[in-house]
Amino acid sequence: MAGFCDSLGSCSVPHGLTRAIAHPPSYGRTDLSSGRRLWVNSAALSPAPYATGPGPAPSYAAATLAVPGSLLGASGGLAGADLAWLSLSGQQELLRLVRPPYSYSALIAMAIQSAPLRRLTLSQIYQYVAGNFPFYKRSKAGWQNSIRHNLSLNDCFKKVPRDENDPGKGNYWTLDPNCEKMFDNGNFRRKRRRRGETSEAAVPGASSPEGTALEPRGSTPQDPQTSPSPSEATTTCLSGFSTAMGALAGGFGALPDGLAHDFSLRRPPPTAAAHSPQIPNTAPGFAPGHQTGATGFRMGHLIYSRDGTEV
């Protein structure tokens, strides 16, 4: 800062220089657009000096933050969604990078419907896809294989042999009339149905009027003479065993005569002796309250054994 100092050491700043400091120059930036911009002084970039008090808030903190007018559209928002800011060459390059939102089946259907006779060869389908969608011009190996797979596996595409009077190579592909209604605005909604699902879709017993369709799928009526049935002896034995367990919970008085005699304290049950270890009876004078505990140990072996031969 330039100033004038006298011999006594006091300095003063000229009035014109004070006004120049209060209003800094614009440094020749008036050639930019007239939109509102945010100017940051050097004080905002440098660290704040140490101060003893809080002091007033800086003046640049209340400055209006505005986006330059050159980045705003006519409506005040970013107008880049319609790609108007891109040149024609830039838009074409963007179309080469973005994949079209159509499935391969939709591309095939679009190509077939664009033909005058509604039929095209495989090479003509390739030409249609590559000519109308620049994305598929880069690599042809991947999507061409997908086109062939969709033609072979999708039931909506039918192969038509070439006539004898029609010279050329390859068969024609046409669209099934039943599937034309399912093609709407490039969205091929029909999904390929597997052959296994088609065979399983038939409901068994639907042709019989007696209402056999209520039977579960895969179940066939069994002949009681030919199909094996559970053993009657095993069922009777388990039924008797369940009855004995219910009676045991109520007390020994409700047990049958044979089981009550087997579960006595003087003699262990003969069927449990062959399959479970016996507990020696050291106290022949047990009270009736101890009988359930002593017998319950041997019955636990019968309950948790899974061989099925203990009863």
Curated annotation (Swiss-Prot):
It holds the Pfam family Forkhead. The keyword Glycosyltransferase does not apply. InterPro entries: Fork_head_dom, FOX_domain-containing, TF_fork_head_CS_1, TF_fork_head_CS_2, WH-like_DNA-bd_sf, WH_DNA-bd_sf. The keyword DNA-binding applies. Gene3D superfamilies: Winged helix-like DNA-binding domain superfamily/Winged helix DNA-binding domain. GO terms for cellular component: nucleus. GO terms for molecular function: DNA-binding transcription factor activity; sequence-specific DNA binding. Keywords: Activator, DNA-binding, Nucleus, Transcription, Transcription regulation. It comes from the Eukaryota. Residues 219-231 have a biased composition (Low complexity). SUPFAM superfamilies: Winged helix' DNA-binding domain. It is found in: Nucleus. Residues 188-237, 263-294 are annotated as: Disordered. Residues 99-193 bind DNA. PANTHER family: FORKHEAD BOX PROTEIN, FORKHEAD BOX PROTEIN I2. Possible transcriptional activator. This is Forkhead box protein I2. It comes from Mus musculus. The gene is Foxi2.
